[in-house]
Amino acid sequence: MAIEYLGLSEINGPLVVLEGVKNASYEEIVEFHMEDGTQKIGRIVEIYEDKAVIQVFEGTDNMSLGNTHTRLTGHPMEIGLSPEILGRTFNGIGQPIDGLGEITPEVSLNINGLPLNPVTREYPRNYINTGISAIDGLTTLIRGQKLPIFSGNGLPHDKLAAQIVQQASLGADSDEKFAIVFAAMGVKYDVAEFFRRTFEESGASDHVVMFLNLANDPVVERLLTPKIDLTAAEYLAFEKGMHILVILTDITSFCEAMREVSSSKGEIPSRKGYPGYLYSELATLYERAGIVRGGTGSVTQIPILTMPNDDITHPIPDLTGYITEGQIVLDRQLHGQAIYPPINVLPSLSRLMKDGIGEGFTRADHQDVANQLFSCYAKVGDARALASVIGEDELSPLDKQYLVFGKAFEAEFVGQSETENRSIIETLDKGWELLGLLPREELDRIDTKVLDQYYRETVR
């Protein structure tokens, strides 16, 4: 039975304190009824003796200490879901904002989800094609993987996210059901409108579920958006048998919201002012990716985060790296050279790539091509460093060939237009074309039989 209380003992930013509480539960949803007839919703975030600290989703404006009626609902926050959510746009707490009316829920699920039993997890296999060579060829995204994008302020991660949404697929030969669940947290209105317009104009919106939390929305809502987004993804994957790609941008906004709320609660801060439980909170999001043994669906994650001051050792990218299975790093220097997407392939990594590529998945030579491209591009850095000391004219003919290869690799393999959707075969063929700029004897990471089949000298 729901219990109702009259009055609050304290209001502090987005938090209120209720005294004399009985049988309250952590994460329980609370309803507030103000004297002017308006209503608000919150959730219990801390319980101490008979006191409950409650986060108010819509902010604490118009709330008074004496005349606010508080009702404990007795259950955590849930979201109503059905297949109708495909093609729809919601706000950060799951309310439709596209003018198409309410959905008819088939089921209501707790947004905190249920942890996947490690024993029931299936090891990720097979790949998701993004149409972007630097990702598909060198840091391949595997179904069930969590592969973050490390970006920085001013870099085109929004444009890259939109391109992935438009182009992502399970491959030309797959007839399995595929959809994207997209969440934007703390974004400006023009960025949200860019995503909405881009998805609609490209026709991608039909297989996209979008959750938008704007910069002027309550900060508490930002903490719920990724959980609601992932709950929708789990429903489509594990109950409807679909392969779901989840894109979360910007995780940094989520963490900053957590820091703000933690400060309001008077908690002792940890690194850079973030709460000590930042790691566990990020883990509760990232670990919701995966495949359940015996099921047909999967949840794959691409969380996008902006590194403050491009610092990869900042707590957010640092802790993210511990939890996830690799990273894709955007580079400001490449962006300054007008290379899009500005992916720096050397610090980028997909730890599960080896198990979802090759014969039966992409093409038999995929791993060899990737290894050789990494090796050759690393030598480009050595040649450039030497040229900066002695001058390019003094380099050996081989070092000059590496400089030519490096320039072509950045412009033609890493670089592509935002509307160019390359198949995995086109990506691998492009890799062989660029390797043809170097002498065959330099390709020491590839078996002789594979070289005989694919290597052709490229003359320019």
Residue ranges and their predicted role:
Residues 70, 77, 81-84, 96-146, ...:
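P-loop NTPase nucleotide-binding/switch module
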Residues 137-459:
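P-loop NTPase catalytic core
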Residues 1-4, 10-130:
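Acidic-enriched and Gly/Ser
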Residues 11, 90-92, 129, 135, ...:
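Short glycine/serine/threonine-biased micro-segments
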